[in-house]
Amino acid sequence: MMLYLTHGNGEESMPLKLPASSSQVEEIDIRLDDICSGEGNFRISDVKSSVKGLWQFIRNADLLKPKELEKLNRLSRHINVMSEKERQIFTGALLSESVSSLDDVLRTVGRIRLYEIIPEVTCDRELGGYLVEHGRIDCPEHLKPYLDYVGINV
């Protein structure tokens, strides 16, 4: 995973490959302070990752805090060993969960095994039907015609 870091208005950015050390982050912070005009926080301006849309979930991480950097390093290590299918599942899980912090992202990556991709399901009604027909939700046969399949997956 590659982070692009900047200061201020983001006219210049520098890459940081994760996992990284705090000394690497501090060095980039100092270099950016010299080349970026204007005042502003040291921040993540972009993320290149095999997990689509990851930037929106980690952009507020404060890399100058060692605990935040360690969390990002852990996330990077998780992603580095994921298969393509696991990365797709992770992308979907991030979009379906209420993710508002780096801790939420790490919790989600830790629960990847609880998610699955069901290719034949494209809407709520199909998901409800899939869950009932495949025994994920126990329902007596005589009640199936009366089920609200759209509401089942909620």
Predicted segments, located by residue:
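A short beta-strand micro-motif
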Residues: M1-G8
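Intrinsically disordered, low-complexity segments enriched in small/polar residues
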Residues: M2, R113, K144-L147
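N-terminal interaction modules that seed assembly of large macromolecular complexes
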Residues: G10-R74
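Residues that form generic nucleotide/phosphate-binding pockets
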Residues: I28-R31, I35, H78, A93, ...
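Long amphipathic alpha-helical segments
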Residues: D46-R136
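Acidic, proline/glycine-rich low-complexity IDRs
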Residues: G128-V154
